[in-house]
Amino acid sequence: MGKVYDWFEERLEIQAIADDITSKYVPPHVNIFYCLGGITLTCFIVQVATGFAMTFYYRPTVTEAFASIQYIMTEVNFGWLIRSVHRWSASMMVLMMILHVFRVYLTGGFKKPRELTWITGVVLAVLTVSFGVTGYSLPWDQIGYWAVKIVTGVPEAIPIVGSSLVELLRGSVSVGQSTLTRFYSLHTFVLPLLTAVFMLMHFLMIRKQGISGPL
């Protein structure tokens, strides 16, 4: 094993990278509330893992979606646990995100030179809420159906472009298969990809600028 490590060390300088990560200065004023962002990241990772597991059994069609959820909950080994963890971690992610935003705002972490870090954080907050909106509809039960109908109907109040926006969100004039397909694609591909990109930007800026000082 030593020779294998030395081979990689010679080419990648793993020890230097590890030293840089572990030797970063942490200000003395940092407390447990500064961990809220990391907890949010942990919830996102749990979401990705459990969500990926459910894609093996979930069927994104209006006729089979609800039945596939029932199958996951009653027939798949530990399916009930995987889906429950997915739901619990989703709620936890939203809660931790809100608390993290409050902590950053109250401690002035959005001020110069960290404006871009704050902006990427706001984008991540919007993406987090979008996860909730799109994921809520996927079981395609009565609650999910009417939630989608209400949410996608909101833009209709916008003058001129309202009807076009509603049709864009739904995929057609009314809520149906096209709507479920779009929400499933957003929830499982578009939103996770955007979230991963903005999280990377967010953490790289935090790494570069360090943790903000006390007020």
From Swiss-Prot:
It is found in: Plastid, Chloroplast thylakoid membrane. Gene3D superfamilies: Cytochrome Bc1 Complex, Chain C. Its cofactor is heme b; heme c. Disulfide bonds: none annotated. The chain crosses the membrane at residues 32-52, 90-110, 116-136, 186-206. GO terms for biological process: photosynthesis; respiratory electron transport chain. The keyword Nucleus does not apply. Pfam families: Cytochrome_B. It is a multi-pass membrane protein. Heme b 1 binds at residues 100, 202. Keywords: Chloroplast, Electron transport, Heme, Iron, Membrane, Metal-binding, Photosynthesis, Plastid, Thylakoid, Transmembrane, Transmembrane helix, Transport. One of its GO terms (cellular component) is chloroplast thylakoid membrane. InterPro entries: Cyt_b/b6_N, Cyt_B6_PetB, Cytb/b6-like_sf, Cytochrome_b_N_euk/bac, Di-haem_cyt_TM. CDD domains: Cytochrome_b_N (cd00284). GO terms for molecular function: electron transporter, transferring electrons within cytochrome b6/f complex of photosystem II activity; metal ion binding; oxidoreductase activity. Heme c binds at residue 35. PANTHER family: CYTOCHROME B. NCBIfam families: PRK03735.1 (NF002990). The 4 large subunits of the cytochrome b6-f complex are cytochrome b6, subunit IV (17 kDa polypeptide, PetD), cytochrome f and the Rieske protein, while the 4 small subunits are PetG, PetL, PetM and PetN. The complex functions as a dimer. Heme 1 (or BH or b566) is high-potential and absorbs at about 566 nm, and heme 2 (or BL or b562) is low-potential and absorbs at about 562 nm. This is Cytochrome b6. It comes from Chara vulgaris (Common stonewort). The lineage of its organism: Eukaryota, Viridiplantae, Streptophyta, Charophyceae, Charales.
